[in-house]
């Protein structure tokens, strides 16, 4: 009886180990590298004036109250208005460089923003892999 019990515990442990290792491999396979098109889509929300949607892309705001998210959207709107006054607004934006972290779960993006007054700047956006998709940090 005791041998049967030990054999049962061993078998259950083996099955549990197999299930947990298979699950982590599945998650690894699902993560895709960040692509330029996704960065441009997210920055396009800002560029088009959809500040609430831009803030919704921020993983850091997921658990924030709605009032905080509204403040963040208002801050981005104010920043865009300043860009409009000083530089005529954003004409275009393009990805210069994607730098993934060692584990691939975070990517720093250098984005070149061209303004209507013929000036430009390079900005850094940080993206993180959260819940099976890329989000602004």
Pin down the residues of each PLM region.
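Positively charged n-region of N-terminal signal peptides that target proteins for export
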Residues: 1-4
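Bacterial N-terminal signal peptides
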Residues: 7-16
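Exposed beta-sheet edge and beta->alpha loop/turn motif
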Residues: 92-137
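Short, low-complexity N-terminal intrinsically disordered segments enriched in polar/charged residues
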Residues: 19-48
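Short solvent-exposed beta->alpha transition segments
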Residues: 36-40, 52-102
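Short, compositionally biased low-complexity segments
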Residues: 6, 46-51
